Amino acid sequence: MLEQECYINTDDELHHDNIKQVESLYKVLEDMVFAVIKDSIKMDCENLLDQAVQAILEQEKENNRCISDIKANNPARPRKWKQKWISTVKESVDDRLKELPKDETNNSSSSLSQSFTNLGKIFKKDLTHIVNHLKQHYPDDFDVCNSYAQHYHQAFLAHTSTITEFELGDKDTFFLLCWVHNIYPNDILKDPSLAGHIDEARLKCLLPAQKIRDYESNYVSSEVLTVKSWINKSLDLEAQFWNVGKEPEKLDEAYHTELHIDVLQNFNGGVRRAMEISERLTNRLKPLLAAELVEFAKRYKSLFEEYLEKNKNQQYLWPIIIVNVNCCWNFRDFVTQNFNDAQLQRHKENMNSILLELEDLGYTVLLQNLFQDLKVTKKLAFYSIHIDSLMDQLLHSF
């Protein structure tokens, strides 16, 4: 009412003084209201916040009255407190982000992951606070959760854009894809405390589609090469052990090799890492890794065949053959149980075929040595059901 009276007649000096006083009071009130709004993101000031929001609503109501009243002559209206609320929300978010700890590590990969982790933590913490302590004080049309979320999201966009201006190594590429596909959308936006409060459809994707495709292609190529390198190193070490001619290690009184364990751990590790990014990328990577297992099996067979040809009189030939046949069984068990998807059937068949051929190489040498002293004159049917059954029994006895 005082404001209305001041602006009814502005000709005399008294009214000018009154207007100054009124505007001065409004400025004090405005500063107090938006100080509360700004601090509310990190403080428990619900009573003050309730009063501040009510003050904004009152000003919006008075703005609308002045707009609808053609007789109203108030140049101070509209006061635009609602617009200032939006800018204050952004300012409060910006201030919160300035409080993030500075990275002190010299490791670029650690720096990238830590910077995103810090952003994610403050996003989840602050949005949870907004849901639990601020949202109920605002009318629905303020859309308070999405308003705050948009500004945090802009910070993510800016940070991601800055990061991708530089060439990323394999670890950074992996982490960035994990963040874009999994951590941010699932662990943060879909966190139970935030579920239903943030409209994800209104949040722009953190990376352009083409950049995502490029990073995914780089990641897949790198992962395939990494797994290929490690499984072949394992095979090379195993082949060196054969040629040295030492007795294989025993586990529970049985000859034992770690080859299948090392190889399958590397294969599963590649699949597991892809799952940390997305199921879609896993489905893309898994057939490529399966193809590398097939190539591994071919090389395994070739090296084993070469070993048998060069070491026919080696002291521990039999135990080495036995551990490799057992190793093949473990590989075949794995592909039988895990390569059941349609896209893996061809690799499953190829893998089993190669492994069976490798086993037969071992069976042949074992049978030749076994029956040599018996002076068997007629040609043996090495691959008959009877012989296979006999070989299985012999192998299980070691």
What are these regions (language model features)?
Residues 1-244:
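Extended, noncatalytic alpha-helical scaffold/tether regions
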Residues 210-398:
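Extended alpha-helical rod/solenoid/coiled-coil scaffold segments used as assembly/tethering elements
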